[in-house]
Amino acid sequence: MAKKIFTSALGTAEPYAYIAKPDYGNEERGFGNPRGVYKVDLTIPNKDPRCQRMVDEIVKCHEEAYAAAVEEYEANPPAVARGKKPLKPYEGDMPFFDNGDGTTTFKFKCYASFQDKKTKETKHINLVVVDSKGKKMEDVPIIGGGSKLKVKYSLVPYKWNTAVGASVKLQLESVMLVELATFGGGEDDWADEVEENGYVASGSAKASKPRDEESWDEDDEESEEADEDGDF
């Protein structure tokens, strides 16, 4: 079955976005993620009509999927080991929240790799990033908080488990970079502390280069690609 792809409104990336490269966590501190995760929290003005439609689409997807899951649970209750309590259906947090300041933040993510079911080989996923003209970028810059973005995404409902309640994952499919805000590295904070005859960095970060054109229109579209990433 084809997967429906949605396009977000223009929004502002929050800090700690992982778009150019995935986040692998910190294994030494006990929260490593060997599969890697691309992710971005995108804040959109509530006055943008698309913002409310995004909320409505997510809520509808969740309500329909949750109702079906509860019906299935009641019709076929899972077997429970003696002395154990059954895990009853419950709902989790939605992947968005109203900030109370006229904006809503949506949380998008996807895995950066998957295991081939036949070969058991790990396949890496390169997140597609396009420029404001819809051209795929070969060298994706580090995209910092404050960057203006649009994203393409799919809705992936998931059931409750012992860790989280039933909700919807906003599966990140691709990103349009409209306005870039990079990490300044705190250079302005050092303006008054210049040391003469010291080390001077040579060159600057590479500009992003367009590679090939990809359709990135405003309308929702259908994608036939299989969802290899799975749920969180």
Curated annotation (Swiss-Prot):
GO biological process: DNA recombination; DNA repair; DNA replication; viral DNA genome replication
Protein name, as recorded: Single-stranded DNA-binding protein
Pfam entry (one): SBB_T7
This protein's UniProt keywords: DNA damage, DNA repair, DNA replication, DNA-binding, Viral DNA replication
Annotated InterPro entries: NA-bd_OB-fold (IPR012340), SBB_BPT7 (IPR049476), SSB_T7 (IPR016411)
Top-rank taxon: Viruses
Quaternary structure annotation from Swiss-Prot or TrEMBL: Homodimer. Interacts (via C-terminus) with the viral DNA polymerase. Interacts with the viral helicase/primase. Part of the replicase complex that includes the DNA polymerase, host thioredoxin, the primase/helicase and the single-stranded DNA binding protein.
Domain notes per entry: The acidic C-terminus is involved in modulating the ssDNA binding properties. It is also required for dimer formation and for interactions with the viral DNA polymerase and the helicase.
Disordered, as annotated region: 189-232
Record-level Gene Ontology MF annotations: single-stranded DNA binding
Naturally occurring in which organism (per UniProt): Escherichia phage T7 (Bacteriophage T7)
Family note: Belongs to the Teseptimavirus single-stranded DNA-binding protein family.
Cited function: Single-stranded DNA-binding protein that participates in viral DNA replication, formation of concatemers, recombination and repair of double-stranded breaks. Coats the lagging-strand ssDNA as the replication fork advances and stimulates the activities of viral DNA polymerase and primase/helicase. Coordinates simultaneous synthesis of leading- and lagging-strands. Together with DNA primase/helicase, promotes pairing of two homologous DNA molecules containing complementary single-stranded regions and mediates homologous DNA strand exchange. Also promotes the formation of joint molecules.
Composition bias, Acidic residues: 214-232
Region: Dimerization and interaction with the viral DNA polymerase and helicase, residue numbers: 212-232
